[in-house]
Amino acid sequence: MSTPTSPTPKTAEVPARQPWPRGRRRTVALAVGTLVAASGLVSAAGYEAYHASTPSPAVTHHEKADGTTVIIPAASQNPIPLHGRIDTVDYQQEYQGVTYKKQALVYVPATYVQGVPANIAYLTHGWMSSAEEMADEVSPAIDDLERSGALSPTIVVFATYYPDRSFVNDDFETDYQLNRFFATSEINTLIDTIESRYSTYADGDTTDESLKASRTHRAFGGFSMGGITAWDVFALNPDYFYGYMPMAGESWIGRDHDAPLPQIADEVTLGVRSRGMGPQDFRIIASVGSDDPALDDMNPQLGEFYRRYPTLMTSQSLQVWIDEGGTHSLASVSRQ
């Protein structure tokens, strides 16, 4: 995963190995903030100043009398529950002729008011992981931003691409079929379920027209295989999202036919190009740890995106953040 450094990714003359910006910040929280800032709702500089001065908390869990669970920063002498809350939302998804009962975890900020639209971000995990694990790592960082007032009201949805846990196995490559399905089909089910329940800029209307009109207030991200999912969403389903956060994952578009880098760049950008979108119509924050093997997979693609489409993939529309010393782990995600 990565961290932002001022816009330094180059657009045209990109060396074989790009010297991406490096540092240590909490990627997911800051990325959500930056994507929100890109819509003019909050200052990105404010996010960076906040994160530079705020340590990443350890967390513990406490079950309340009513059976709900709160996540508590363990580092504090007087632990305080999340300022916001975590809801569990049930939905059903059909996959290969079978209907599965699924759950998503929804971080709802304390600043949320029913009837007042909030921004929304959808996040998914990596191989063998779960929505619960990602929520545990990321929610405290998001909550810190909400509590400080640095983040405009933003709902964060943690979802799994596994129909159920029987799909988890020791071959991560088999996940890609599920990643593709989630990016092109299940995400639509999830949006319909979540945004008909919570107040977002879709205003309860999950028709195609409404979701397109409210896309600047919606982002999608993921870690590892979830990052690969994020690239699929950008390539194949860009109508509903403005922001994308692929963390420690390159695009697998074209993998089934061993596409060379120029063709991968063509296929990844085809969705926005075919819709007449320009660099002002999306923001990608691609992040990875400096000690993560995924960096070597992402680096050639990112360089090719800048090279082949310099007026589309600019230093603003495609940002690359590197977490110095970061590995392929959720700990790196939360730290960045």
Model-derived regions, located:
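Terminal targeting segments of Actinobacterial cell-envelope proteins
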Residues: 1-25
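Non-catalytic cap/lid and distal C-terminal segments of serine-dependent acyl enzymes
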Residues: 29-33, 38-336
